[in-house]
Amino acid sequence: KESKAFREIMAAVADPVEDAVHQKVKFRINHIMMQKDWAFVDALPLTTEGKRIDYTGTMFEEWIEEADEVLWVLLRYKRGRWYIVEKEFFTTEATWIDWPQYFRAPSGIFPRRKFN
């Protein structure tokens, strides 16, 4: 069973995504970790039927060919709710790598980096 914190985090993540893609979404979660009042989510937005989103007519339409379809979100719990501190949707770089230092977020919430 999903925890209350998990549901609140994913609701906070869903709001800007649903606004941007003009539809309700669900997520395939690659990584989610919470520590104290911080959380990091790495997820792929999908349609409510679990299919890939058609970005035609959205702000991401031009990016779909050049960038990776990723969603990384850093959240902080303040004043009784989860707030998005930073998010990256469609990118070619792992921009979250600097977030622990830049936002002073606990490094333990982020995925372990693999170096080849």
Go through the PLM ranges and name each one.
Residues 1, 31-35, 93-94:
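Short secondary-structure boundary segments
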Residues 1-24:
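Short, non-transmembrane alpha-helical segments in secretory-pathway proteins
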Residues 14-17, 53, 60, 111:
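Polar low-complexity intrinsically disordered regions enriched in Ser/Thr and small residues
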Residues 24-79:
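Mature extracytoplasmic domains of secretory-pathway proteins
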Residues 46, 60-63, 94, 103-107:
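Short, low-complexity, polar/charged sequence segments that are solvent-exposed and flexible
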Residues 69-101:
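Short beta-strand edge/turn micro-motifs at domain boundaries
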Residues 96-116:
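Extended, polar beta-sheet/loop recognition surfaces of beta-rich domains
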